[in-house]
């Protein structure tokens, strides 16, 4: 197995992405993304902080998040194990990623 030590070497192993995967990256929510998020009952909240990365499952019987506007999602923090890993990471480093899943669908929205 060969080690990959540069971005150029990595990209040399793959074809360029097709236009459709590139087109789905948006700076704000689209109507389709808003609908998907409203149907999602499970989301994975991923954060990064001084001790590394963390992925926290969040679910509910109704919508998991509230859409405040096309740039802001509200995700409640339910009582859990009180480890606060994700919240600590957000305080230290505001980068977050959300992966929304809808029951019965094979696709996800990130």
What annotation goes with each model-predicted range?
Residues 1-110:
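Binding-site signature for planar aromatic cofactors or substrates
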């Amino acid at each position: 197995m060969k080690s990959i030590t540069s971005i150029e070497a990595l990209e040399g192993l793959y074809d360029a992405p097709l236009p459709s995967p590139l087109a789905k990256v948006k700076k704000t929510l689209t109507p389709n993304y808003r609908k998907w998020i409203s149907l999602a009952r499970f989301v994975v909240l991923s954060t990064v902080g001084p001790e590394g990365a963390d992925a926290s499952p969040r679910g509910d019987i109704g919508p998991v998040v509230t859409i405040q506007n096309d740039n802001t999602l509200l995700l409640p923090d339910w009582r859990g194990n009180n480890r606060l890993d994700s919240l600590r990471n957000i305080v230290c480093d505001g980068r977050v990623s959300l992966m929304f899943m809808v029951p019965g669908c094979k696709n996800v929205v990130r």
